[in-house]
From Swiss-Prot:
GO terms for molecular function: translation initiation factor activity. One of its GO terms (biological process) is formation of cytoplasmic translation initiation complex. Keywords: Cytoplasm, Initiation factor, Protein biosynthesis. Its main location: cytoplasm. It is found in: Cytoplasm. This is Eukaryotic translation initiation factor 3 subunit H. The keyword Protein biosynthesis applies. The lineage of its organism: Eukaryota, Fungi, Dikarya, Ascomycota, Pezizomycotina. It comes from the Eukaryota. Belongs to the eIF-3 subunit H family. Component of the eukaryotic translation initiation factor 3 (eIF-3) complex. GO terms for cellular component: eukaryotic 43S preinitiation complex; eukaryotic 48S preinitiation complex; eukaryotic translation initiation factor 3 complex. It comes from Chaetomium globosum (strain ATCC 6205 / CBS 148.51 / DSM 1962 / NBRC 6347 / NRRL 1970) (Soil fungus).
Amino acid sequence: MCRASRRRSSHLYVPSQISDKDQVPRHHCSSSFPTTATGSIVGMDNNGVIEITNAFPFPTVDVSGTDSHQSDATSLAAAAPRAKANIAYQNEMIRHLKEVNVDANNVGWYTSATMGNFINLSFIENQHHYQRDNDKTVALVHDVSRSSQGALSLRAFRLSPEFMAAFKEGKFTTESLQKSKLTFRDILVEVPVVVHNSHLLTSFLHQIPAPPKSAEIPLPASLEDIRRDPAQLPAHPSFDTLDLSIDPFLEKTCDLLLDSIESHYSDLNNHQYYQRQLTREQFKITQWQTKRKAENAARLAAKQQPLPEDEWQRLFKLPQEPSRLEGMLNARQVEQYSKQVDGFTASITTKMFAVRGNLLPE
């Protein structure tokens, strides 16, 4: 069961918890890797707590498995949550679940990710599609690459109310962003995730022997004690943490971080080009207005009818400012990669200091 609670305050939403034991998203995301996998999650709102009871994937169009068609499959899967055919499919699935007495209400959707690379326009459009009808819906992100390291990577997000209002207006200009004080940190609101094990798994974990609490172990008094309580070895520690090689996930994250920084600078260069074009056109308009005022002054001196001074609106056309949304998403993705690199370097730095200590002469 997956639960999410949210309390309403005067200015912001305060998320509480999400817990998940439904393995449909994880299996679907892992089997579809590296293609993006999306699906719907259903449940109910129980006294402010969203309980996720089931999940099912969206049907996708079969394409060739070659590299030339992989991007097409990813694009189709990324746009699946807001496709008309999948909306009808989702409603039909919810109707069937209710027929078998399953608490099934639309509470969000899930998607897969690779090394935290999920903050894009398609993700925003999908979440806005769900959240505009129900502000309690969440986007569940399962990072398959991070989960392959042994620790489940499952995160939940909502769009902030400020970003929802700005996205509804469709204005992401410099003036509107300065007026609303909206930054890239205000795009998403993360909901903490708590994973609950099933009863069978909990029972199995309790059966795993633990190391002795004290160094002195009482000896058995008889042979019957040995037969009744045979010695069980505890779980062995992992020696992979002693590997001195650089984590390949750290290298890949650094590559993705550099790509995001390049995309951010490309968007910044486009905006600077727009500013240069705007300054050039405004200078031409100022020159034209100065010339027209001089002509009108001469015509008034000659007792002639002055020419219209607003004719520049027909002669000149100011360039349209590009949307700053893509730049905000790139900045948010750069922050995401930076946090991942910071998490990786904690263990890498320890290994580097250990190697340095062994290399230095005593």
